[in-house]
Each structure stands twice: as C-alpha cells, then as structure tokens.
C-alpha cells in the first residue's frame, strides 16, 4: 500500500458518518486506503462503520490509549509508504490529496507535510490547530501562519506558498512511515496534545524537512474530543510543552529556557486566577508538579534525542519571544512577526 489514511476515533460516530463520504469520494487514488482505528469507543462508532461503510477496514483497540499511543498501536498494524493521520472532525476537499502526494514523491528530503487548515465553522478563516503550518519561538510557544495565540486571520491567499515549517498539525499530518518510526513515533507518555510537535522536532533535528502545502485545503471543526476551554486540555498543553522542551532542547539552551518558563508559567497561572478561571489556574500548577515528577523518566529520551540530532539550529524555531512581540509590540499576525 502506498498511502494509509488513518483516522483514530473515540466516540466519534456522528463525525465519522458526516465526513466519511466526502473523504472516500475525494481520496480515490491508486494505492490509497482509508482505515479507522477505534480507541474503545462506547458509542455506536464501530457498528455504524460496519453498516454504512463496510469497505473501510477497522482496527479495534482494547482501551482508550489516547492520541499518541492509539496511533502508534494502530500504525504498527498498517504497512504503507506514507501515513496520513487524519482527525475524525476534518472535512477534505475535492483535490486535497494529490498536491501532498505529488510533492512528497519528488522531495525525498521531506519527512512530513500538512495541507492548509481552514475552520469549518468559519470557512474563510484559518483553523487554530494548524493554519498554514506551525513554528515555535525561543521559549517554546507555538504559532502558525494564519494564527498567533488566539488571533486568527482570514485566508486571503497571503500564505499560499509552500513553506518549510517547524511542525505540521496532527489534525492532518502526512508522514513517511520510515521517518515516523526512525524518529520513534509519537511519544506514548504525552497521551494527547503537542505530541505531533514533539515528533516533528525530532524529525527536524535529524535534518528531515517538514512543509506546508497550501494548494491542499481541508476544513477542521476542532475541539471535537476535548474542548479548548476544558482545564484538562490546559493541563496537557502546559505539561506536554515542558516535557517536549526538556526532551529536545540543546544542552546550551536547556537551563535558561526552563528557568524562563518557570516564571512565564507562573505568570500564566496568575492571569487565569485574575480571570477567575480556577480550573485553568489549578491545571497550570498541576502541570508543573507533573513535569517535575515525570522528568526523570524522560532523561533517557533526552539523551537519545541529542545523540541522534544532526543540528542544534532549526530556522523554523525562531529566535524571538512571541509573548513580547504579541503583547508589547502588538504584532498579532505571522506576516507582522516576520517582516
């Protein structure tokens, strides 16, 4: 098989029923197979798939392993040159697949790519989870072409060029299977959130490219599994971000970045408290505690990542403070940040 489009599902019967017909119709290429892996859903997802889409192979996992381990377990059962990790709440478009495949086939130096993500509920806007490709600042804060923190741009074609990026969104991530496993796959310990960024960092550190191909467009609902306002999402984002930094930062930067993040995370917690967001306030504090508890378990991963790394300098990990640019200099779009 050349391309396996794998949807990891958890209680997403409604999403699958809504978006699967378009996916099947728009993915008719030789060597392409759509597969649904199920994280032990308690709804009728599997029964619905067997009834409505019997041609789609199903992989049943015995419990909810989360995004990272769920995908790893599913992909070990799939033989393909390319994997496409696709969220169940993504609606593809007529010509979404060909630009991705065509580019990857002639650029062997590129490990992974993503399409342009637009918001399904606001289709003229970029979507939060990936926009037109992601970057990271000096202190570990993420932003995209088309989205800086909560400032989301309208898509007026301003980012319609193919561009190297630091990370590609897990909502629709095309990756060579060889690169996926060479980098170790998604980190099971993350459970969910930022695990695709961690994977992309490991691939970039090995001098493998990641790009956004905006000729390909998909629409993403976002928050279908875990709502943005859920304190558990806040916890996972803060904890996993710290673990990712610890795993991947060059030795020369680790101490300074982690010291700065200690103060910045404290400031974020106080801002949540000032807004009476008690759940988010406690989530940040819990994330710090969990990071300290888990840190020894990640020491071997850090050592291995540094040994495998071919470079300390990744241009798409930009050397400025996003917080300073956004809140002090009022630069709230990708274009204003980079010009």
Placement of each model-derived feature along the sequence:
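Conserved donor NDP-sugar-binding/catalytic core segment of glycosyltransferases
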Residues: 91-130, 134-141
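Short, acidic, metal-binding catalytic loop of nucleotide-sugar glycosyltransferases
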Residues: 21-31
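A conserved acidic beta->alpha catalytic loop
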Residues: 22, 38-47, 63
């Amino acid at each position: 098989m050349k391309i396996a489009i794998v949807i990891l599902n958890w209680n997403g019967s409604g999403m699958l029923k809504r978006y699967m017909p378009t996916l099947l119709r728009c993915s008719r290429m030789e060597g392409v197979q759509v597969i649904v892996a199920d994280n032990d859903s308690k709804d009728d997802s599997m029964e619905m798939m067997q009834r409505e889409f019997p041609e789609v192979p199903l992989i049943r996992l015995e419990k909810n392993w989360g995004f990272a381990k769920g995908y790893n377990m599913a992909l070990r059962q799939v033989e393909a040159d390319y994997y496409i990790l696709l969220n169940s709440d993504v609606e593809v478009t007529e010509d979404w697949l060909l630009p991705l495949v065509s580019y990857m086939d002639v650029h062997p130096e590129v490990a992974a790519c993503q399409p342009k993500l637009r918001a399904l509920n606001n289709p003229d806007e970029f979507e939060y989870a990936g926009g037109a490709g992601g970057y990271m600042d000096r202190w570990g804060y993420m932003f995209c072409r088309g989205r800086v923190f909560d400032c989301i741009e309208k898509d007026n074609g301003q980012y319609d060029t193919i561009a190297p990026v630091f990370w590609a969104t897990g909502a629709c991530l095309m990756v060579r299977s060889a690169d996926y496993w060479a980098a170790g796959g998604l980190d099971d310990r993350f459970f969910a959130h930022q695990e695709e960024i961690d994977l992309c960092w490991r691939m970039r550190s090995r001098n493998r490219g990641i790009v956004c191909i905006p000729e390909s467009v998909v629409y993403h609902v976002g928050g279908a599994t875990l709502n943005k306002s859920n304190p558990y999402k806040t916890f996972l984002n803060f904890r996993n971000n710290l673990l990712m930094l610890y795993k991947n930062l060059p030795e020369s930067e680790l101490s300074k970045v982690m010291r700065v993040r200690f103060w910045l995370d404290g400031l974020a917690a106080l801002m949540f408290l000032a807004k009476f967001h008690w759940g988010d306030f406690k989530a940040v504090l819990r994330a710090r505690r969990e990071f300290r508890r888990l840190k020894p378990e990640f020491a071997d991963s850090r050592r291995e990542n540094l040994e495998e790394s071919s470079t300390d300098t990744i241009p798409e990990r930009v050397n400025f403070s996003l917080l300073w640019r956004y809140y002090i200099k009022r630069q709230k779009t990708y274009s204003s940040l980079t010009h």
